[in-house]
């Protein structure tokens, strides 16, 4: 029972078992889920960000349990890291804008954040690649996506600064 719950958690309710591009599907599901939470249910972005931080710490343990007997320490079916990484820029965007944007602007921004996160997660610029290559454990699995999410934040902040 515990192993089944852990499996559902680290695979984001089975999304990680999708044969092709499970990370992209997990990022897309996360983006849609967060849009629903923020713009349909009007959840507080601060509460969601705190929840993501809690999920980060739970994930360190859960992913470690999942990969402990595997040869591949970063299996494709583990996509909770995509959830965490994709949630960072979206949550910070929502905190910065306090829900003040029109729906079209929000959808465009979410799409851009999704694309940027996937690019940074796939090409792994430094230090994303550092965590991916040097930490063959749950910390490395998760931190490369956290850093990819922070890259998205950096790009968006740079864009906002340069466009004002």
Task: Report residues per predicted region.
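N-terminal membrane-targeting hydrophobic helices
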Residues: 13-19, 31-32, 39-40, 87, ...
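Hydrophobic alpha-helical transmembrane segments
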Residues: 24-29, 46-53, 107, 111-115, ...
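Intramembrane alpha-helical segments
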Residues: 26-33, 58, 93, 97, ...
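Hydrophobic core of alpha-helical transmembrane segments in multi-pass integral membrane proteins
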Residues: 32-36, 49-61, 153-157
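Core hydrophobic alpha-helical membrane-spanning segments
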Residues: 115-116, 155
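Final/C-terminal transmembrane alpha-helix of multipass membrane proteins
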Residues: 145-162
